[in-house]
A protein has these predicted regions:
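Glycine-biased, small-residue-rich flexible motifs in mid-sequence functional cores and linkers
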Residues: 2-250
């Protein structure tokens, strides 16, 4: 499908450049309407989570679904894939924001997952109908994908992420795996536009683990600190209140 419903975004965005002019999609576009928007939780994180991190992520995603939430992520390997798969395994609805065309799913390893998302009532969305012409443009699309994950969510959860410069191992694995894979971008934009920001963090086990360095940075952010996702905070992820900057499709 294709939509240009810019007039129906109910846009109150502080930076209107952030609003997509159109979206290409497969699946249920109503997952971006007003009522569903209140239930949309973005989940971001690194590409190479440990087994322990993966289990912690699965546990809270399952709880979000149990509470009636929808999951948004970027269809990348690692934490993104875990979020989408756990949602589907728990009979939830998930939205995948793509950095590529709908007919050129990236990464290729997730083509079957993308199809399963649509078959099970979810949604694939992208801003792109053509291929990038150069490496810089291709890299920029991953950053833009991260932006939309933030815009289409009511709240966002960072599973785990390194503190590293912005290079995309997701796209160029030869650059090294120890990157934030866009988590920093998504979390920053979420803060800028008033989304509730949460991180996984256990002081006794995660303090010296570099996989949680970005989590620690966000917790210590003096202007807009993130919160640790606890059992009680799970109920606040979907409190029925709409944030200020909302691109909604009705």
């Amino acid at each position: 499908g294709y939509t240009t419903k810019r007039d129906e975004y109910k846009t109150k965005m502080p930076n209107k450049k952030g609003a997509p002019h159109y979206l290409l999609y497969r699946g249920d576009i109503s997952l971006l309407n007003r009522e569903n928007f209140k239930k949309n939780v973005a989940v971001v994180g690194l590409l190479n989570p440990t087994a322990d991190i993966a289990e912690r992520e699965k546990a809270f995603v399952a709880e979000i679904i149990k509470r009636g939430g929808n999951i948004i992520s970027g269809l990348a390997l690692g934490c993104d894939s875990i979020a989408h798969k756990t949602c589907l395994e728990n009979n939830g609805k998930t939205i995948a924001v793509l950095p590529s065309r709908l007919d050129n799913i990236l990464p290729r390893e997730n083509i079957d997952l993308a199809n399963e998302i649509v078959v099970k009532g979810g949604l694939l969305v992208t801003e792109y109908y053509n291929e990038p012409v150069e490496r810089f443009e291709s890299s920029a699309r991953y950053i833009e994908r991260d932006r939309l994950q933030a815009y289409f969510s009511n709240s966002i959860v960072l599973v785990a992420s390194y503190r590293h410069p912005d290079k995309y191992s997701e796209q160029y694995p030869q650059d090294g795996i120890k990157r934030d894979s866009g988590s920093r971008h998504a979390m920053k934009i979420a803060g800028d536009i008033g989304r509730k920001r949460y991180v996984l963090f256990n002081k006794s086990t995660d303090s010296l683990n570099e996989m949680f360095d970005l989590n620690k940075d966000l917790l210590s952010d003096k202007k807009n600190p993130a919160k640790i996702l606890t059992g009680s905070e799970l109920d606040n992820l979907m409190d029925g209140k709409l944030p200020g900057a909302i691109p909604i499709f009705e």
